[in-house]
């Protein structure tokens, strides 16, 4: 058993903003702290279900968020087990993930969660990931 989080839909419904409405497009950003908190709560629920069931419930994230190298670090730091993305995104995501420990990913995730806006959350995470600039990301 596993839990799969579709970040595109999660973001749309968490922010109550239709992706097709231009005036609300700025809200459809998976870096929104509210969306990150929903992911964290989902992971926590899956861990609780794992204890109750006596077997691990894996949490997977699919959608554009998993393909963002900086956000992938945050997702892993939040406890996400697997990331589903298009093949073209794998090299950059893998390079960035290999550059941090799990403890560092958790620290970066917490920094993002502390922010008020999506822009601040993204900036806080990127500030902790100098490899992004080194790789031109």
Residue positions per predicted region:
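Non-catalytic helical/linker scaffolds that mediate oligomerization, partner binding
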Residues: 1-137
């Amino acid at each position: 058993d596993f839990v799969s989080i579709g970040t595109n839909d999660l973001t749309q419904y968490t922010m109550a903003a239709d992706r097709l409405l231009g005036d609300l497009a700025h809200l459809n950003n998976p870096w929104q702290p509210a969306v990150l908190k929903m992911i964290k709560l989902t992971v926590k629920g899956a861990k609780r279900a794992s204890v109750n069931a006596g077997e691990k419930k894996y949490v997977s994230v699919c959608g554009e968020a998993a393909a963002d190298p900086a956000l992938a670090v945050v997702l892993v730091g939040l406890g996400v087990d697997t990331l589903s993305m298009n093949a073209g995104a794998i090299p950059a995501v893998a390079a960035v993930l290999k550059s941090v420990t799990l403890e560092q990913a958790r620290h970066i995730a917490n920094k993002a969660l502390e922010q008020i806006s999506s822009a601040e959350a993204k900036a806080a995470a990127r500030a902790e990931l100098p490899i992004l600039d080194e790789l031109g990301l």
